[in-house]
Amino acid sequence: FYQPDMTSRVAASMRLESRLRQALDAEQFVLHYQPKVDAASGVTVGFEALLRWQDPEVGLVPPGEFIPLLEESGMIVEVGLWVIHRALEDERHLRALGLRPGRIAVNVSARQL
C-alpha cells in the first residue's frame, strides 16, 4: 500500500546515496582507531579500524546513518576495499615511524567475502 511519506523517504535515500558517492570521491571517509586492550594485563594489543564520515556540511555523521545505505546500495564493497587499503597504509606509516601497532581489525561486509 502506498503512503504519502514513501516518496519523501525514497527521495531522501537517493539524496543520501548520492552524497555517499561524493563522499567517497572527495575522500570524506576517515578511519578512527579504537584500542583493543588485553583485559588481564591492561596492555594495548591492537586496534579496530572504525569507518567514519566527515561531512563538510554537517560534521561527523554517525555510522548508523550511512552504513546501512552503503549495504543496501552495494557501495559497501567499494568502501570496504577503501577501508582495508587505508588501514594497511596507516599501519605501514606507523611502522615507518618505528611504532608497533599490533593487529588492526577491520570489519567487512558479508558481501565482500
Task: Identify the residue ranges that each predicted region occupies.
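Bacterial c-di-GMP phosphodiesterase EAL domain
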Residues: 4-113
